[in-house]
Design a protein with these regions (language model features):
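Alpha-helical structural context detector biased toward long hydrophobic helices
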Residues: 1-6, 10-312
Length: 312
């Protein structure tokens, strides 16, 4: 496979929109023992400024194993990283963000609290596709494949140690990078099902006056309607109805709503609107719940779920 490569599962071109200097991110670290009170002594345990290069990154996350062609259709090592993400998916996301970020700034400057948006068919397509790809490229949807692959390798290793099964020693496990892609973000049937459904949903753009929409290592939040607890994140696009939230920048949010379940969204369909800090806090909670390791705040304000020490 050649040299090990560090590859981002949330692209740096996206993360920079939440960076306070263009190269670093105010980061809340999950998995730490979290206190309810922030002090100068303990806040460095879970709030840090981290380089864009060191978050949402993994070794050989997209690298195809060319020595395992039977399990990856003989693809070249860098085809996912270069041909799909670098040459196609990420430029499309960058263009979409640029287009609607400019509109968001205009809305804020003009104090237009609600305005209709004349989306082109191409814009609607690539907004949905960008959300679909980013949702599926996250590690959460890869963990089960890694577990299956580990079990397979252990079984093959055990069997190969028996003289009667020596031929199994040359059998490789899954190519996890390929299988992840094939089952999720490169799965055309799954994409068609997603797009057919979401094309009938209401699309809204929200603009925060405060400019502190969080993002995370799982930035696209999809909530299954009617579910409770952790089951809200277990979405089947074939059967379930859902809502989607995708922060494009620290002040711009993309949202989709089922009009049958949320009839009030019909009058807001294809609009861009300014929201207050209360609304910002609500969708920021979604990022916190959806994240695995990192939550990012442009303003370094994590007071939503960590209270500052009282003076009293």
């Amino acid at each position: 496979m050649g040299d090990t490569k560090r590859q981002h599962y949330v692209p740096r071109t996206f993360l920079k929109h939440f960076s306070f200097v263009g190269k670093r991110l105010h980061t809340f670290l999950l998995g730490k023992e979290i206190t309810s009170v922030i002090t100068e002594e303990n806040k460095s345990l879970f709030i840090k400024d981290i380089s864009l290069s060191d978050v949402c990154v993994s070794q050989d996350y997209y690298t195809i194993d060319e020595s395992n062609p039977s399990n990856n259709r003989g693809l070249k090592a860098m085809c996912l990283e270069k041909e799909f993400f670098q040459d196609f998916a990420e430029p499309k996301l960058t263009l979409i963000i640029k287009t609607f970020d400019e509109l968001a700034h205009k809305i804020l400057n003009d104090k237009q609290y609600v305005s209709s948006v004349k989306f082109t068919d191409e814009q609607l397509y690539y907004l949905a596709l960008s959300a679909f790809i980013q949702y599926h490229r996250s590690p959460r949807l890869r963990h089960s494949l890694e577990s299956v692959n580990s079990i397979m390798k252990n079984i093959l290793s055990t069997l190969a140690s028996d003289k009667e099964h020596k031929d199994l020693s040359n059998i490789k496990g899954l190519d996890v990078a390929f299988t992840h892609a094939d089952k999720t973000y490169l799965n055309l049937h799954l994409w068609r099902m997603f797009y057919l459904k979401i094309s009938n949903y209401c699309i809204l753009l929200r603009v925060s006056e405060n400019g502190n929409f969080f993002t995370s290592d799982n930035p696209v939040v999809i909530h299954k309607l009617g579910a409770k607890g952790k089951d809200t994140l277990n979405v089947n696009f074939y059967a379930d109805e859902f809502s989607l939230f995708f922060p494009l920048t620290s002040h711009l949010m993309l949202e989709y709503y089922n009009p049958t379940c949320f009839p009030e969204a019909l009058k807001m369909n294809k609009t861009i609107s300014i929201v207050d800090s209360k609304y910002e806090n609500q969708v920021n909670k979604y990022q916190y719940i959806n994240a695995e390791k990192f939550v990012f705040s442009y303003k370094n304000d994590f007071s939503l779920f960590l209270k500052p020490i009282s003076n009293g």
